[in-house]
Amino acid sequence: NRLFALIGLNGRAVLPMVLGLGCVTMATLTTRILHSPRERLITVFLLALAIPCSAQLGVVLGMLGSLSFTAVLIWTLAMVGVLMLAGFLASKLIPGRRIPLVTELPPMRLPIAGNVVKKTAGRLKWYLIEVIPLFLIGTFLMFALDKLGVLPAIIEAGEPLVTGWLGLPKEASAAFVMGFLRRDFGATGLFAMADALNPIQAVVGMITITLFIPCFASLLMMVKERGMKTALAMVVIIVPFAFFVGGLFNLLLHAVW
């Protein structure tokens, strides 16, 4: 609770944050448990910006872990630093006050197996109905954009930024586009290029792809929960911020590593 107070939240926000390490789409929905619109807005923003889902996290740690512990440490410190800085700034800029954590502590009891199975089945059914269609819509949209020639145009337009500012090969621009479909696709695209990347490029690429906009399903869930204007405003903030941080680490790491 004291840690989350630094970013304008209370200890209740730990639940969506931890769930975000599994699936950001699901975690966005769980922000409903927070008491105020301000807390829900800050939490959704931080989930979209700096919380990697389990699939992306596995790829990131697999790639950087094969390089060195230093690479993993730099990435971890970057994510924690961005999370705390962005949360602190958001808590100062978004009007409202922090609501203190007040919760009841029920007596500890052994779970009843039947209740656990029933509730798990209910949550699974809800997930399949609410979330899976969003992934299907995202897949179809990316397929249509590819066939219409929009994706190649976006990839080509992003090459100067990827090569000049981030210091990555031009092929890496495709990974960022695929990361919009699913976060782990972007990280996997960089992982497939591991042999062509030096340690600095690998760290910079993974920092940028982690901070990049969430997957299409998460974006649709953000629209559903926070509204179209708020979701688009978050995207407008997150995309340049991710590239700014990535380029900054590119300059810093070349200077000291």
What positions do the PLM features span?
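Juxtamembrane inter-helical linkers in multi-pass membrane proteins
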Residues: 1-24, 96-119, 165-170
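Transmembrane helical segments that form the transport core of multi-pass membrane transport proteins
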Residues: 3, 120-199
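C-terminal transmembrane helix pair
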Residues: 12-13, 25-72, 188-257
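Generic recognition of stable, solvent-exposed alpha-helical segments in well-folded globular domains
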Residues: 13-16, 25, 29, 76, ...
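Alpha-helical transmembrane segments of multipass membrane proteins
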Residues: 55-56, 82-87, 138, 142, ...
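Alpha-helical transmembrane segments
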Residues: 71-86
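Structural signal for alpha-helical transmembrane segments and their membrane-water exit/capping regions
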Residues: 91, 107-110, 139-150, 253-254
